[in-house]
């Protein structure tokens, strides 16, 4: 028969003389998840749960439990009394509760129920060990873990040999047991020897049972046991009928509910599958939780060492456990599935108050703590959710901050993230949206999106050609057939300009019109080629002038390629082609025939954004300059063809495609602004071009200021440069700047591959150029042009040294190449030139997941230009530094370091997750660092120490030699001398947060390992430790750490 010993909570009548069972020891034996409600509080009693306890005690299936028709599924009761018991033979703990059903309740009872949730009756310091066969043998004694012995037992006197002492511990029945605690053996360990075998035999302990030692609030050593669950023989029906027990308890509850009279129940926490007497506050709180199918949740389970662990699961069903006998009951009405395969033995049905629902918000940009710790290789799957991955695969040119940071973007105004996700599923919505947006780029890119969605398995070069056509053709003009003479073409341009302004909106959305443009392209190429052949026959000029004109040829050759790919200004392109005809290999790589008829096809079309028309005199001067340069063509063209033929077809396509967006920006200028800009820049631009040419003659000095020469030295060049339009001069200067300094980059030349929002960057560049037109100052305009060069192809000096051009692989094979930023042409025609490092390059990049090639428009500005123009540096910096991997992986890899400016060609900056736009700026509004100076991230070298109610301190952890010095110093800092050094005091606990954001007890690790992994230290009170154990609070650690390391944060060593 069970012992009827009472507790100090509510002693039974007539038993006040008996020694009360220690509440902490009772709860320690009951388990870490057991918490009885306080007396006087309101509870909810579930008869189904009570029947399950009886069935578990009688080893009977739940299906055979009888029901009781007149008993409701739950009863709201008031807890009148609570008595703690322990069996005198087995030490099994159980509780006796007296409940009284209530129809209404007062405020005090409800308040008592709420306060009961915050009370933690588990002991602060204890350890539990499952006995092994050697522990239960008659010799050898009980082996105690070292850390447990140091925390729970009094300290040994190590001056003795061997160190030993006598321990006295009391059990649940207040019986004292004496043990000899000795430290011996090889290796040495803590043992309980004398008295242990007597305890084992008296309690009839077996291997698998557990023994626990605790220190109560009075620092008394207490001893308890937990018996392992073992199958027991079923009782004979003649001795006791389980059905009669079920009917008896259900009848008593039904009678009490009908008459509002008290009734008594017994609760066995070790035998009952779940608590069936729940605090009303806990029940009401659970009912407010909106559960649904598929919801994720956590649930606490007890571990072998008396700790707790959270298991993750998913709600798979909602319904009655027994719809026939207990209809509309909340008892185990949730059907769940568990994540871990080891959790297969967990029950499949739980109650709503037993789980902790997990809110899973939608992250379009995953937080830092969801990211992998190790960098990923290109093409490897990412940890992003599936929705985000699909979003990026469909629109790889959009940056991560699209529709989040720049919600007022002029490209896609009024489109929320939800609408974009809907467009991903329905491409027709994307086409409809593109018709309402006034942007020269949207229609072409909308078509490109549909192409990607519809043909994700196409060859990358085919998709490149498709996108190139969609981006170029909307900017071409449909007009009448171009006449053969050059001047007749010039005379038609004013009329074509007005015609273009009327037709352009329809051109951007008409595919048929694009086909007509392609035909017109070929027709114009035939007429322009005739003019080219006429100019090539006039090749007779002095050879001594070849050196001075060689640099101009190099400049205009690059200029020609830009105009060929973009089709920007027809008249300028014609004059340049007359002077410097492009090699046939250039357009051959674009997929055009080698025939001379196609060598000028792209430049012959009249364009809406043409700036100024040359006069007859200018045309004749251009022809004279062309005759002057024909001799140079013979010597240079063969070399240029050889260089370009060494490039593979995809590489040339990439180089030309990246110029398209740059040319489109200028086409947005109206004629009035164009004329104003040209008149202001005319004189200054000619001087700049002459200075650049003289620079080449005098050895390529690095200082532009040294190029200023006397008027007599500039005079011989006036006849050659005066014939050129100011647009050409400005573009020529920009073309000189594009070649850059071969020494400005030390990285080998490969392709940089990354999904970047090129569309928004292009529009920013367009707005910047419009602002530049409105500025009346010539010097300011020139500074704007110099601070914003055209997007170019960088020249890397090591491209010839490390990666031979003729051995390059196709673009799709360069995904694993080094981290250089662009392709490279041969620098031999431009050796000796040195230009400012502000001339950064543009990159042709690709999404590494589907190899979809895209052209990125990078505004390569200095930091001050970025700030003064109000550009979003959060996007711009991402663009400039994006690599062949996803730029968010780069952020992870470089979050604690700075970029190397010599390798990337951009100012150093420290990156934060999300491509932070924080830029160090001085009071004057300028960047605090030079353009190429390294900027290291601020690193904390001292360790933070925090204690609630006190100001935090910072210490140098490396100056301490051991834990004792650390504890003593911290105790002095916070005015708790003597309370941290004594390991047996329970007032304060010293814990630390390691580099994995786990909270551990200071002193468990070796000192050297502790110094290397500690991030911060916290001094917790006993109440804080208990609250952490109850709530599972890890002090601000991210949620996933709670789920992953719950076995560590709530084990037997909590305190």
Curated annotation (Swiss-Prot):
Q: What induces it?
A: By auxin under dark condition.
Q: Which residues bind DNA?
A: 127-229
List, as start-end ranges, the regions of compositional bias called Polar residues: 757-769
Region ranges (Disordered)? 485-510, 532-565, 585-609, 701-720, 732-769, 1034-1055
Here the segments flagged for biased composition (Low complexity) are: 488-510, 532-552, 742-756
What protein family is recorded? Belongs to the ARF family.
Q: Whom does it interact with, and what assembly results?
A: Homodimers and heterodimers.
Q: Which CDD domains match?
A: B3_DNA (cd10017)
Which Gene Ontology molecular-function terms are recorded? Answer: DNA binding
Among its keywords, does the record have GTP-binding? no
Q: What is known of its domains?
A: Interactions between auxin response factors (ARFs) and Aux/IAA proteins occur through their C-terminal dimerization domains III and IV.
Q: Which Pfam family is one of this chain's hits?
A: ARF_AD
Location in the cell reads: Nucleus
Q: In which tissues is it expressed?
A: Expressed in roots, culms, leaves and young panicles.
Gene from which this protein is expressed: ARF16
Keyword field: Auxin signaling pathway, DNA-binding, Nucleus, Transcription, Transcription regulation
Q: What is this protein called?
A: Auxin response factor 16
Highest taxon, organism lineage: Eukaryota
GO CC terms: nucleus
Q: Which InterPro entries match?
A: ARF_dom, ARF_plant, AUX/IAA_dom, B3_DNA-bd, DNA-bd_pseudobarrel_sf, PB1-like
Originating species: Oryza sativa subsp. japonica
A GO BP entry is: regulation of DNA-templated transcription
In this chain the PB1 domain maps to 940-1024
What function does this protein fulfil? Auxin response factors (ARFs) are transcriptional factors that bind specifically to the DNA sequence 5'-TGTCTC-3' found in the auxin-responsive promoter elements (AuxREs).
